[in-house]
Amino acid sequence: MDAQPKILIACNRHVRETYLAEADLEQLATFAEWDWFECEGGGIYDTNDDPETTKALGERLGNYDGLVVCHGCPTLHAGILDQAPRLKFIGELEGDRFASRIDVDAAWQHGICTVDTTNGSSYPVSEWALALIMISLRNAGAHFRRIIGGDLTPSSQDDFGYINGDLTGKR
């Protein structure tokens, strides 16, 4: 491996312009040489199935030590990985836990580590969900007793607090 690893980022233009902040790319440049392979097609859960894009990516991978993939990237199967003898790791920015963009078995057979960052927001999201559950429990006992008592009338849509979501002063 050269003094600095070479990293290829394979994604569509939208990801390049909105997900990858210039400050992050500048930080990456402090310890690695990086380049961008633009590939349009596919989406969050499906990959780019254009054979020309797949061929071009395979031809380009031979000079890289790492690959970061996201929306637009073709599926990284054994045929592509055969063309990447230097490749040591593949990172997935977002998606479905490698289900579509990375053939994990093929990567492991080639000695390539795979890293998935799609769960990077799991803790903040779970904290937010817990907070919403706690908020929804406000007056839960009273509402439950009302329902058990046969009062199935929803809140009046004329109620200012109902329409505007105002919880001030409620207990």
Question: Where do the protein language model's features map onto the residues?
Answer:
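N-terminal glycine-/charge-rich "phosphate-binding" loop or analogous flexible N-terminal tail
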Residues: M1-D65, C70
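Phosphate-coordination loops involved in phosphoryl transfer and adenosine-cofactor binding
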Residues: Q4, L87, T168-R171
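Short, conserved loop/helix-junction motifs that constitute active-site signature segments
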Residues: L28, I80-R86
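Short gly/ser/thr-rich secondary-structure transition/capping motifs
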Residues: D46-E52, C70-G72, G149-D159
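A short helix->loop->beta-strand "cap" motif at the edges of active sites that frequently abuts
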Residues: A84-F89, Q109-I112
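ADP-ribose/adenylate-binding Rossmann-like module
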Residues: R86-R101
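Rossmann-fold NAD(P)-binding glycine/threonine-rich loop
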Residues: A99-I112
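Phosphate-binding beta-alpha-beta segment of Rossmann-like dinucleotide-binding domains, i.e.
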Residues: H110-R171
